[in-house]
Every structure is written in structure tokens, then in C-alpha cells.
Swiss-Prot record:
Superkingdom classification of source: Viruses
Originating species: Commelina yellow mottle virus (CoYMV)
Record protein name field: Uncharacterized 15 kDa protein
Length: 135
């Protein structure tokens, strides 16, 4: 009990409640028993409970603000996809891929086609894979 009676909060409670019925009584012994002694102790107890309640409310407010900040940070990290890729684009890219493959198969010696067909097909394949991930 000696640690409690030496604490800052305990001393503050006695100081504040001393204004109601002097001298204030916190932890008392058998000699303090009586209506006045109990009233003094209850005043001190009420003060301490009110102070703890205020501290809890402050902590709850802080926790709420921190949760809101965490949510806003999480929303900022989440990629936003506004809509699915256009099916028309995927279809056209598929047509290009097929067309390039046919040109190479029919005549690899066509000027410019033999040099650029394979890399172009690979690029189109990569683009198609990216678009298909969103479907």
C-alpha cells in the first residue's frame, strides 16, 4: 500500500478532494471509520474514477485516429483498377499476333518481316498476358 500512497495520482486526488471535506482521506484504517471518513474516501475514489475515465476516453480517441490513418495508408497502397481492360484491345492484339505468325510462316524472307517478327510476337505475347490478368 505504501507505493500507492506515494504515487502522484493518489496525492493529486487527496489534494483535489480536500476542498470538499478537509482533510481528505484516501486509504484509511479502523480509526477513520464513520460516515465522514467514508464520505471523504468516496470523494477521493470518485475523483480517481473520473480521472481514469477521462484518460480512457483520450486513449480511445487516439486509437480511433490511428486506425483511420492506417486505413488511409492501406487504401493508398492498394492499386486501383477502374475497369476491366477493353475486350476489343485484347482481340486486336490477338489478331496482330496471328497475322505476324502467318507472315513468317508463309514467307520468312519477306523484307523486314524475318528480322522483326519474333521479337514483335514476343512483345505482343507479353502485352496479351498483362491484359488477360485483368480478365
Amino acid at each position: 500500500m505504501s507505493n500507492i500512497t506515494e504515487s502522484k495520482g493518489y496525492k493529486e486526488a487527496l489534494s483535489v478532494t480536500n476542498n470538499y471535506l478537509a482533510p481528505a482521506i484516501g486509504i484509511g484504517g479502523a480509526t477513520d471509520v464513520g460516515l465522514t471518513g467514508v464520505t471523504k474516501q468516496l470523494n477521493t475514489t470518485i475523483y480517481l474514477v473520473a480521472k481514469i475515465t477521462q484518460q480512457i476516453e483520450d486513449l480511445q480517441s487516439t486509437i480511433k485516429r490511428l486506425e483511420e490513418r492506417v486505413q488511409s495508408l492501406e487504401k493508398a497502397k492498394t492499386p486501383v483498377v477502374t475497369q476491366d481492360p477493353n475486350p476489343e484491345i485484347i482481340s486486336k492484339l490477338s489478331d496482330i499476333q496471328i497475322s505476324l505468325a502467318r507472315q513468317r510462316a508463309v514467307n520468312p524472307a519477306i523484307s523486314g518481316v524475318s528480322n522483326y517478327t519474333a521479337p514483335t510476337i514476343k512483345k505482343v505475347d507479353r502485352i496479351l498476358r498483362v491484359f488477360k490478368k485483368f480478365n
